[in-house]
């Protein structure tokens, strides 16, 4: 057989190239899905917040990842199972709001961030992928190219191709402009926030101008746009008492397990003996009352709230592992529940923002679908709840156990021995944070001296042992080491005045007498601790950090910042930069902000 001529080879190559170029784009790469964060929650408002949350979870070993295929086909972004090729999730390409890359920010060194509008839903979510086989930058370029092709090929005037059958909304009349989103690492640039979530069909995409569809600008939720912000929290947080919360969680989980065991016993009996239906009112076919189901659903919601509070303190079994076990049990209970819509009717207790964050960060796609199917009373935190406030939830347990009084309400002598397992923070006493000062008799103590400084006596000066944060206009925020003048010590809460002339009530047990030999009415130390102000220079910030006894690593990390930069840092940024001391840094910064009158 003779060798083909050069011209024949060229023509065959040309034909092959043209056929390949005319084929629809099919992009498929293996990636590691790290997490999906719904934007607009209390802590995650923009894509870079999702990255910060990932960094926090990575530092704590709480990331639950999954290998999968990221595929672009027929105008859709598909997430497929590696082995079965089952579709785990999918998003329309024109619902992609932003594509970004974060390199070498944590143990995951090549992160692709894709922010999408979920089809038919009001929420906007950011998906984070580790791109090991194909770099995140290359994958971003491929996705942007696929998006451009999809928008260029879309027919005009409302005619859509078969791949759009699953989409309910009208098509765009013009391409979505592709622009580079701001880098995720820009922490101190002006904030870009997503607008408040609206129903998918509230505004037709046909009326949206190209500029408003840009990938780069996310209006602040505080900008005037006719949206009414949710009301402030209507309930005060419970006192911090991790050991008590662990005890409550153990009893809650045991009751959930007992109820599931009861269902399994009934199921086993029914498999051998056919039961009659509807024998008693308000009883299901398995003989368990509706009230028992409601009680179990309430305890499941309570368990999520407790896991959200304890997530950072858990050691042997992580919070995501507990969530997975609870969802397995919940799935079984739902399969036995005679009323499909019963969980949606269980309003109290509403989930806390921390519980919502935990579920959004660790649920698998099937679990996430199950969670969302339970209704808004399960997926909306109490901070975002717009309905009537439900009654407080007081659980009752099968064994008659009652939730003990918080340790923060116990006498001070019992609190010195309280410690948190696994906590590296400096120990501090817990005061009755949920009982603001008032003149009720319960705040009086006959053992306290009933005296107040008279005009003829020298003012009584005392030093603050532990910082205290005011919660109303009657109380006074004080910092550790501060010298105060005691004006009234006739009750458990003393009236004091600071050096700035501000007065207010604080717990008496956070004060101690000045050291012996210190002149009363004057500061004992000659050295004046440096103040942190918005105008503070890096050397002043460094001096303030050192005076607050922060670690050398923290001083070196934060000492290069201006005062304005440090005072405007958010908790997530502090947690990322200084994970060990972030809570204490945040507490001290909050005290400084209040002294400066900052609303941040």
UniProtKB/Swiss-Prot annotation:
Major place of residence = cytoplasm
User: What residues bear Phosphoserine in this entry?
Assistant: 238
Q: Which GO terms describe its cellular component?
A: cytoplasm
- Name the domain of life: Eukaryota
Tissues in which the UniProt entry reports expression: Detected in embryonic gut. Detected in adult testis, placenta, adrenal gland and intestine.
* Residues in the signal sequence: none
Cell location:
Cytoplasm
Per UniProt, residues of the PTB domain are 28-155
Q: Listed disulfide bonds for this chain?
A: none
Q: Which family does it belong to?
A: Belongs to the EPS8 family.
Q: How does it assemble?
A: Interacts with ABI1. Part of a complex that contains SOS1, ABI1 and EPS8L2. Interacts with FASLG.
Name it. Epidermal growth factor receptor kinase substrate 8-like protein 3
